[in-house]
Structure formats: C-alpha cells, structure tokens
C-alpha cells in the first residue's frame, strides 16, 4: 500500500509540473487563488445572487443530463438489458394469475425497503447538507411504535394499515407484557434498512478519494482538497476541530477495519472524513464498506433505536409531562398541549379519533409538520446552491488556462 501511495504521489507531482508548463509556481500563491475561488463560489447562493444561482443550476443540470446521456449511449447493451428486464417485470405485474399474491407481497416488501434505504442515502449524501431523515422520519416512527406498544400492550398492529397508520389490535395484551426487546424487534427492519442506506451514502467520498489518488489528478471535491490541506498542516494544527479530524484520520489509517467500525458505530459528524481517508490511503473496498455497513446498520442503529425507545417509554413520557407542568408560572399552559396531543394519539390507537376530543389541530403536531417542511425546503435549496457552485467551478477551471497564458 505504501509503494502504491508513493507512485501516486510521484504521478501527481509530474502532473502538477505539466499543469504549470514547467514553471515552478509559488505554492502559497496557488493556495491563495484556490481560497479566493472558493470564497467566490460560496457567494453564489439563492439569497445573495438568485438569478445567477438559478441560471448556473439550470446549466449544471443540463451538463449532468448530457454526461449521463453520453454514458448511457456508450453502454447500450446494459440499457437494452435493463429495458428488457423492466418489460418482463411490468408484464408479470399486470398479467392476472395465481402469481399475483406473490407479486403483491414482493411489491410491499420492496417499497418498504426502498423507502427506508432511500431516506438513509439522503441522510448521508445531502449534496452539501444532509436531510436529517432520522430526526424527521425514522425517529418519529420508532417513537410512535413505542407509544402505541405501551398503550395497546401489544406490537401486533393490524396490517394494513400498519406501517402507514398504527391502531391497536382488537385483542389487546395485558398490562406489563411489553418488553424493550419486543419493540426493538418490531422496528428492526425499518432501522436496519435506514442504516444500510446511510452506509451506501458514504461510498461517494471513498470512490472520489480513491480515484483521485490512483490517477494523481486534482479532484473537484472541496472536502478532499481540505483533507489534503489538513494533511499538509497536520503538525501545526491547533484548533479543536482540526485535531478531531486528525484523530479520526489517524484512527482509520492505523487501526484499519476496527478503526472504521468504531467511527461508523458512534454517531459523529466526521465520518465523511473517514471515507475520504480510506479512499486516499487505498483501503480495500470490502474492508471499508464491510466495517461501515456493520457499524451503521447494526451497532449504531441499535444505539439510536434504544435511545428513542427508552426516551418515549410510557413512564418516561409521563414523568416529562409532569415535569413540564411543575415549571413555575407557565407550567400548566405548556403542559396542556402535550396532554392533548398524547390523549389524541391514544384515541386514534383505539379507533376513537372521531369522538371524545375536538378535531382541531394540536399546535405541537402543527409545529412538527412545519419543521419538516422547512427542513425539506432547506435541503432542496442546498442542492440548488451546490449545483450552481459546481457550475461556477467549471467556469473557473475553464478560465485558469487562459489566465496562465497571459
């Protein structure tokens, strides 16, 4: 591995010399120009330059579509095979017969798995900012199942409508029959699929860094450029953030599989750096992905799942509501919406949502719905800004050779 890294470094040095036409350019001036270009790109956002941002976003979209069209055109055999497979699956889906019961069962499981894996990928990739799908989707789902399990004294919710809607079964269990393990088992599939999605979402930084190291080319990714700058200034790093990043990099590089497993198992915002580090130091794919998959889909997922289940268990929730009511002065007014929300959820579980309480919307659920809308909108805005900045970088890269020849 060390020999491969040395060869890659030699190729990169050679390419840098060719890039500057044999002239030894001061590295500080090159870094200063990169910094100015990065700051210029960071100003291309919707709330500062809306027209330019939308224009660059549209042009970047067209460039990406053109690139993908070209790739698909050069892989016609794969495209034709995929279309034939799609035609066979479509015919199987719509043709009546005894096989339809199996088709419906497979469709249900496929959509369930695809939904949670997709949310996991969105949480990891994000194109600049992750869509925090654990807080928005998986966490509330686990909390709902936990509250329903303690209210119904059972996890055998009728299917359908579960998982779209949770209602108590006609024959409810006896008090105290619900265990922590039964709730963990009920949400295991959703949680594991979400964890698999987050592991898949960590692959792009790994492949980008690995390709850049093998080819010796300068990648377009700013995180990778920051990673290289961090390695160059490793000895002089003083701030906490830089030392934390270096600690992750050293752990992954020196410990290998178990270092990656440790980073993936503990919730932390620095795991993208682990993917870049593994790619940069040419860690084998299955070592990286295997450790990431085990860490995120099994260990980390059970930690997060256990935390949510304990936090939303019946006695903890009742204690929290009582604690809110004990706040001097404003306690009762703050406690009331929580009590109304919990009572409304209990009535829904027992098929009594149409009677007993008014149908007016609780402000607690209203706030959560608006929070989801705001976070999804911010995620979409971040994608637009990121793609616009990518197109601005294309323009800067086209202008650089012209500037050097002046």
Swiss-Prot record:
Return the GO cellular component terms, semicolon-separated: autophagosome membrane; endomembrane system; endoplasmic reticulum; endoplasmic reticulum membrane; endoplasmic reticulum-Golgi intermediate compartment membrane; membrane; nucleolus; phagophore assembly site
**Topology class, membrane:** Multi-pass membrane protein
TM segment ranges: 44-63, 78-98, 110-130, 251-271, 274-294, 307-327, 364-384
Q: What is its main location?
A: endoplasmic reticulum
Cytoplasmic topological domain: 2-43, 99-109, 272-273, 328-363
The UniProt keyword set, sorted, is: Acetylation, Autophagy, Cell adhesion, Cell membrane, Endoplasmic reticulum, Lipid transport, Membrane, Transmembrane, Transmembrane helix, Transport, Vacuole
Q: Where in the cell is it found?
A: Endoplasmic reticulum-Golgi intermediate compartment membrane; Cell membrane; Vacuole membrane; Endoplasmic reticulum membrane
As recorded in UniProt, coiled-coil segments are: none
Does the record's keyword annotation contain Membrane? yes
Q: Does the keyword Ion transport apply?
A: no
Q: Which residues carry this modification: N-acetylalanine?
A: 2
Those parts of the protein on the Extracellular side are 64-77, 131-250, 295-306, 385-406
Any one Gene Ontology MF annotation carried by this entry is: phospholipid scramblase activity
Q: Where does the source fall among the domains of life?
A: Eukaryota
Q: Where is this region: VTT domain?
A: 173-316
Reactions that this protein is recorded to catalyse: a 1,2-diacyl-sn-glycero-3-phospho-L-serine(in) = a 1,2-diacyl-sn-glycero-3-phospho-L-serine(out); cholesterol(in) = cholesterol(out); a 1,2-diacyl-sn-glycero-3-phosphocholine(in) = a 1,2-diacyl-sn-glycero-3-phosphocholine(out); a 1,2-diacyl-sn-glycero-3-phosphoethanolamine(in) = a 1,2-diacyl-sn-glycero-3-phosphoethanolamine(out)
Q: Which GO terms describe its biological process?
A: autophagosome assembly; autophagosome membrane docking; autophagy; cell junction assembly; cell-cell adhesion; embryo implantation; Golgi organization; lipoprotein transport
Q: How does it assemble?
A: Interacts with BECN1. Interacts with TJP1. Interacts with TP53INP2. Interacts with TMEM41B. Interacts with ATP2A2, PLN and SLN; competes with PLN and SLN to prevent them from forming an inhibitory complex with ATP2A2. Interacts with ATG2A.
* Role summary: Phospholipid scramblase involved in lipid homeostasis and membrane dynamics processes. Has phospholipid scramblase activity toward cholesterol and phosphatidylserine, as well as phosphatidylethanolamine and phosphatidylcholine. Required for autophagosome formation: participates in early stages of autophagosome biogenesis at the endoplasmic reticulum (ER) membrane by reequilibrating the leaflets of the ER as lipids are extracted by ATG2 (ATG2A or ATG2B) to mediate autophagosome assembly. Regulates ATP2A2 activity to control ER-isolation membrane contacts for autophagosome formation.
The entry assigns this protein to a family as follows:
Belongs to the VMP1 family.
Protein name from the UniProt record: Vacuole membrane protein 1
**Record organism:** Bos taurus (Bovine)
Lineage of the native species?
A: Eukaryota, Metazoa, Chordata, Craniata, Vertebrata
Q: Which gene encodes it?
A: VMP1
């Amino acid at each position: 591995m060390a020999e491969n890294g040395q060869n890659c470094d030699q190729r990169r040095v050679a390419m840098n010399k060719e890039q500057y036409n044999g002239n030894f350019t001061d590295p500080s001036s090159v870094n200063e120009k990169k910094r100015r270009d990065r700051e210029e790109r960071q100003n291309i956002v919707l709330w500062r330059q809306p027209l330019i941002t939308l224009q660059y976003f549209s042009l970047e979209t067209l460039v990406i579509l053109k690139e993908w069209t070209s790739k698909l055109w050069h892989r016609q055999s794969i495209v034709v095979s995929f279309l034939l497979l799609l035609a066979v699956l479509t015919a199987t889906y719509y043709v009546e017969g005894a096989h339809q019961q199996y088709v419906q069962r497979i469709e249900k499981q496929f959509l369930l798995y695809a939904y949670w894996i997709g949310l996991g990928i969105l949480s990891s990739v994000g194109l600049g900012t992750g869509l925090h799908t654990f807080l928005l989707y998986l966490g509330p789902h686990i909390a709902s199942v936990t509250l329903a399990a303690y209210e119904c004294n059972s996890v055998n919710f009728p299917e359908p409508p579960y998982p779209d809607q949770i209602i108590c079964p006609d024959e409810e269990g006896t008090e105290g029959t619900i265990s922590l393990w039964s709730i963990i088992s009920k949400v295991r599939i959703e949680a594991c699929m979400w964890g698999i999605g987050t592991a898949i979402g960590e692959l792009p930084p790994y492949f980008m860094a690995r390709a850049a190291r093998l080819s010796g080319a300068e990648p377009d990714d700013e995180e990778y450029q920051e990673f290289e700058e961090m390695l160059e200034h490793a000895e002089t790093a003083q701030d906490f953030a830089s030392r934390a990043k270096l600690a992750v990099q050293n752990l992954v590089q020196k410990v290998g599989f178990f270092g990656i497993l440790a980073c993936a198992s503990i919730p932390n915002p620095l795991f993208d750096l682990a993917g870049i580090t593994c790619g940069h130091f040419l860690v084998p794919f299955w070592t990286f992905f295997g450790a990431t998959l085990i860490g995120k889909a099994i260990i980390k997922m059970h930690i997060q799942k256990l935390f949510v289940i304990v936090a939303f268990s019946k006695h903890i929730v009742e204690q929290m509501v009582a604690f809110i009511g004990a706040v001097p002065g404003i306690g009762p007014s703050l406690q009331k919406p929580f009590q109304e929300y919990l009572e409304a959820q209990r009535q829904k579980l027992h098929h009594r949502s149409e009677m007993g309480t008014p149908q007016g919307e609780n402000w607690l659920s209203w706030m959560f719905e608006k929070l989801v809308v705001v976070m999804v909108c911010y995620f979409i805005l971040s994608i637009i800004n990121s793609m616009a900045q990518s197109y601005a970088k294309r323009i800067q890269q086209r202008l650089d050779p012209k500037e050097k020849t002046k």
